[in-house]
């Protein structure tokens, strides 16, 4: 479905429109591209979002004679904020959200406000770290506007009928996701069924190269999941997950404040050192084990819901810690290298560590505040239907 939308030129069209809104001002450009990155990474594969926005960023920076490094590194950071926005925005969200029984709308209600807070805080943090300054006078603003107006948003749109159809179907799909649990007919479908229906409608009304689209499917990711969940099953039967659970029981049961903090910060740390998908899968299995024995674990009954959310936030945000903790950051650094900008491991860590520290501090305060005002509620012990999220493993680090 996403590949069909991409081929229509819709995403590139949106990108250029937003670029023109900035007027060529570096800080406004940072705001626009960061916002675009969050939106794209919320609905697309994080790597795809980084490639789309990153390629446009390179062109824009060349035209405006700006260094692309701060913009691309910022976009790599923002993909992880966008990946936290909805239940299907990233693979860890899907894995943990399914195990915890979190609905699409409930996830958005909890994660949405934090993403907005993190967006603004990270924006000014990145502006400070990279010393991005707005245009200072009217002459500079007028010159930049002339450059930006030279962009043609319709350049990548080969067929306007296909373009408008894609926009209509995309809006319908997003609306279907949001209203999934509220409308009985949609509630009987998995989210993947809604996406498949959208793609089918586009193929029927506007036939295209089906074989070419299928070639773009991330089959290696599908095989990765087959292997991952097979391995998790073996680990579960061999008692490895039980052993991990026993090791984690002490810090996680240390209290309704210490437990969630320990989960969030430790998962964020390890997420920055390794891929967050297997990390989220293993820890979700461990929490599932605690949940299945909730009658015997009073502490999990009291604040288990906070442990689930702490894992979601920790695994999602920790990837900003190192350049290898997030696939989108790897892509951003790769694009920069092609353009002659080399970013070393330690150069990135000096920035990433500060960003993660600020984002996790905000997330910690936010989660406890959200629970206090009733945004985060105690969860049912039963799992969410796996049908709700199967097939949407398109986003990871």
Language-model-derived ranges and their functions:
Residues 2, 29, 33, 37, ...:
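Alpha-helical transmembrane segments in multi-pass membrane proteins
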Residues 17-26, 154-164, 297-301, 347:
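Short, amphipathic, aromatic/basic-enriched membrane-interface segments that mark the entry/exit
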Residues 1-67, 220-299:
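Membrane-embedded alpha-helical segments and adjacent helix-loop junctions characteristic
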Residues 41-51, 68-106, 110, 122-128, ...:
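Alpha-helical transmembrane segments and, especially, the helix-loop junctions at the ends
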Residues 2-7, 112-246, 343, 347-397:
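Hydrophobic transmembrane alpha-helices of multi-pass small-molecule transporters
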Residues 62-70, 206-216, 275:
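Membrane-helix interface "capping/anchor" motifs
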Residues 24-32, 62-74, 102-112, 294-307, ...:
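Membrane-interface alpha-helices at helix entry/exit sites of multi-pass transporters
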Residues 183-188, 255-256, 291-304, 338-341, ...:
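Short helix-coil transition/hinge motifs at the ends and kinks of transmembrane helices
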